[in-house]
Amino acid sequence: MDNKIVYVVSDSVGETADLVVRAAMGQFPFAPDIRRVPYVEDTGTLKEVISIAKSNQALICFTLVKPDMRQYLVTEAAKEGVEAYDIIGPLIDQIEEITGQVPRYEPGVVRRLDEEYFKKIEAIEFAVKYDDGRDARGILKADIVLIGVSRTSKTPLSQYLAHNKRLKVANVPLVPEVDPPEELYQVAKEKCFGLKITPDKLNHIRKERLKSLGLSDGATYANINRIQEEIDHFEEVISRINCQVIDVSNKAIEETANIIVNAVQNQKMF
């Protein structure tokens, strides 16, 4: 039984069938020769695979979601004396019977879910890498650029958009003593969102932040005059960029995120 040939047939990439076959074959002392046949869309290809499998005395394992394709392969393989094992079909049928729901019969669903997962991870890593203006190069690479003074929820909003919307977000803090990066004036204004907050609200947030750190709430960081200076600087920069401004004074992260996503969708940027 050394090098037993197994043809893995799929209407998508064939990763699911490949993994199952390797897991099963791992229980035996012989090494299988697994040959993947992906993206099968017609019975002609199935007929050809059956013929080759017969000549090689091979086994066929398949994941075909469409019932007519599954039935064709099983029937024709049996006629030729070729063993064909349906990996996913019986489970789909059983789930349909139990739930009463009709399957979509749509190939490649698992792969698309995997792709969405990796997009999410990529977006989260992007948000971490380009958080708080760490690297201005991220501004030109980002889907969204958040701009605001300290404590306007730039970081949690970046993470929320990355995790839930798979958007790559860079955020840029503004302070009067530091010139904004030039990239901020080069990126499309439609990608930029200024996060505005009232002085009183920001004063309260910063005082609470200082208390949580065991520091005096009388520090310059929470001084109302300093806060107003920062907000004035923010408005000057935003006026130059001419981007959309969102008042986050009394908004939850989810609310602000929805405003941004709706704006992006309306612009048909993605």
UniProtKB/Swiss-Prot annotation:
One Pfam family hit: Kinase-PPPase
GO molecular function list: ADP binding; ATP binding; phosphotransferase activity, phosphate group as acceptor; protein serine/threonine kinase activity
Cystine pairs: none
Ranges annotated as spanning the membrane: none
Catalysis performed (reactions): N(tele)-phospho-L-histidyl/L-threonyl-[pyruvate, phosphate dikinase] + ADP = N(tele)-phospho-L-histidyl/O-phospho-L-threonyl-[pyruvate, phosphate dikinase] + AMP + H(+); N(tele)-phospho-L-histidyl/O-phospho-L-threonyl-[pyruvate, phosphate dikinase] + phosphate + H(+) = N(tele)-phospho-L-histidyl/L-threonyl-[pyruvate, phosphate dikinase] + diphosphate
The keyword Nucleotide-binding is annotated on this UniProt entry: yes
Listed InterPro entries: Kinase-pyrophosphorylase (IPR005177), PPDK_reg (IPR026565)
Keywords: Kinase, Nucleotide-binding, Serine/threonine-protein kinase, Transferase
Binding site for ADP: G148, V149, S150, R151, T152, S153, K154, T155
Enzyme Commission no: 2.7.11.32, 2.7.4.27
HAMAP family linked: PDRP
Role noted for this protein: Bifunctional serine/threonine kinase and phosphorylase involved in the regulation of the pyruvate, phosphate dikinase (PPDK) by catalyzing its phosphorylation/dephosphorylation.
Similarity annotation: Belongs to the pyruvate, phosphate/water dikinase regulatory protein family. PDRP subfamily.
Protein name as it appears in the record: Putative pyruvate, phosphate dikinase regulatory protein
Species assigned in the record: Bacillus cereus (strain ATCC 14579 / DSM 31 / CCUG 7414 / JCM 2152 / NBRC 15305 / NCIMB 9373 / NCTC 2599 / NRRL B-3711)
